[in-house]
Amino acid sequence: FEYLSEDALLAGRVAAGITRGVQKHPGRGVTIKHFAFNNQETNRLNSCSHVSKRAARDLYLRSFEIVVREARPHAIMTSYNLLNGVHTSESAELLETVLRDEWGFEGLVMTDWVVAGMTRHDLKHPAATSAPTIKAGNELFMPGCETDRQGILSALRGRGEQVELSRSELEKQAARVVRMVWALAGS
């Protein structure tokens, strides 16, 4: 919904209203996207947004904060771009600290389609990969592939190229997926 309005308050309130309207129907959930700093479509796989903490909070994150706090969407989709040199899907500060700890988000965090394990090699910045994406707080890969699975298994075995994953970290993410399935099925 980053395209609803350039005004963060207006975008947040409109998105919150839409989210409440959809989610009032049993078994329906809304995914808010693209979290965050996705302000362009051209070259979006290759962009790195350099944003101060104040501008991030006052301008770019405010609309997301409003919809999370006011409407409790079932899911958030990360964006392709990097934020200050880190893929948004690999940013624990963004996904765990801000989204979950500060705003109280309890839903599912998912990647945009084919963010991890991308086969493109012509990008300025390396593609996001599965293990760091899980460690940062993503539960669902869209669509996920064999490269992702192998990266996760290597990280669990302590042989990950970038990070190591513990069984408890993976179980935490899996529990969030199960909670979402039950929430939507039980509605």
Language-model segments: which ranges?
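Glycoside hydrolase catalytic-domain context in secreted enzymes
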Residues: 1-187
